[in-house]
Amino acid sequence: MSIPRLKSYLTMFAAVLMLGQVLTAQAEEALPDFTSLVEQASPAVVNISTKQKLPDRRIAAGQMPDLEGLPPMFREFFERNMPQQPRSPRGDRQREAQSLGSGFIISSDGYVLTNNHVVADADEIIVRLSDRSELQAKLVGTDPRTDVALLKVEGKNLPIVKLGDSEKLKVGEWVLAIGSPFGFDHSVTKGIVSAKGRTLPNDTYVPFIQTDVAINPGNSGGPLFNMKGEVVGINSQIFTRSGGFMGLSFAIPIDVAIDVSNQLKKDGKVSRGWLGVVIQEVNKDLAESFGLDKPAGALVAQVLENGPAAKGGLQVGDVILSMNGQPIVMSADLPHLVGGLKDGEKAKLEIIRNGKRQNLDISVGALPDDDADIGTGAEGSAERSSNRLGVSVADLTAEQKKSLELKGGVVIKEVQDGPAAMIGLRPGDVISHLNNQAIGSAKEFTEIAKELPKNRSVSMRVLRQGRASFITFKLAE
């Protein structure tokens, strides 16, 4: 090999080595260093333990069981044949249940945020600080709908966390959790933001932050930090099939939690806006049926009588596209936005009605403590049949209309083979709208059914056990 060629190979080899060193250095620079963040934030993170006294139903040796709930014949038999030992009065025997979670201090005078499920039904709450000192905590208030609880401990100049803005959090951003999984105090785990605005079953009013940060029992109520050392969420739930962490963790946005805590501190309870509607997702077929370019918004399936939406002119079949300038991409976006308003505040809605856009201004009400009872349907009279749909229907009675808050509609009497059977309709279902037209009677229903288009998505509003939803179907040639 000639010397020039050898020099060329050596030069190339050196260049490759230098490139590898540069890439390694860049990779090391790209990985965040959490040490200063943890040192700064840890002192304000606390361990929360609770105690709850529960009735102990177990029977001590030699003790007469409680026979109070037995029928007289059996009670007399046991009293005659069992040794006569003193019976402990009902409720005297107790056992103690304990739970463990995390929290963080948000004010130097001792206010602490955690999850409602960490302290629910507790008789005693102990907050343990980073220096291992323990303080008795008072429950200021809880909000089960968001799973937020506010505690108060007696103290001065306590370390506090910095609060961030969860709205500014971006998907892909690094985040870090500090908590007490399985009782291991001040354990640190990290990950990234996987998604924002997640809605979980039975948690309508929280747009959860989804992360892949390792969260386990005991982490609940602890803080989720961004890389600035600011709290952006409260770790609350995980999705799991095994009972342990599977890479899907959910945190309550700190903006939501602080709004709740401020109301709990001021009023001891939380008030939310309420429209008084039942909504559903807009899928591809419904979008076509209602004249939308693509699936988007929240479809109004039911408007509660005398509710804010009814008074403001919102109608069944309207599709809500935005509220106060915020787009409604999915139906689950609407409850978050409405819930953030106070009683009497305005909700500016952009809707589509009969294929045309328009705006409505509605004054929201206060969310009731319990869901309104919207009644159930029963069978009516004046039966008619639609061979095109394969269904027989009858008029609703006056009582049924009042119970369901309907001006008209029909109840299904019989379902034959055909489109109705294919989409799952069954006797007792109530149909209030067909092809975006309100139904006044069984006669109107059959007339509308005769004019339904073929090979195009057709919508039908159905109430089953009082709950309304839109479904779609297509009639073949």
UniProtKB/Swiss-Prot annotation:
Recorded superkingdom: Bacteria
One Gene Ontology cellular component annotation held by this UniProt entry: periplasmic space
GO biological process: proteolysis
Principal localisation: periplasm
Entry's EC annotation: 3.4.21.107
Signal peptide: 1-27
Residue sites binding substrate per the record: 218-220, 275-279
Substrates-to-products reaction catalysed: Acts on substrates that are at least partially unfolded. The cleavage site P1 residue is normally between a pair of hydrophobic residues, such as Val-|-Val
Active site: 117 (charge relay system), 147 (charge relay system), 220 (charge relay system)
Keyword Chaperone on entry: no
GO molecular function: serine-type endopeptidase activity
A Pfam short name: Trypsin_2
CDD domains cross-referenced by the UniProt entry: cpPDZ1_DegP-like
SUPFAM superfamilies referenced in this protein's UniProt entry, alphabetically: PDZ domain-like (SSF50156), Trypsin-like serine proteases (SSF50494)
Listed SMART domains: PDZ
Start and end residues of each PDZ domain: 264-355, 361-466
Keyword annotations: Hydrolase, Periplasm, Protease, Repeat, Serine protease, Signal, Stress response
Described purpose of this protein according to its UniProt entry: Might be efficient in the degradation of transiently denatured and unfolded proteins which accumulate in the periplasm following stress conditions.
Family stated for the protein in its record: Belongs to the peptidase S1C family.
Protein name, entry field: Probable periplasmic serine endoprotease DegP-like
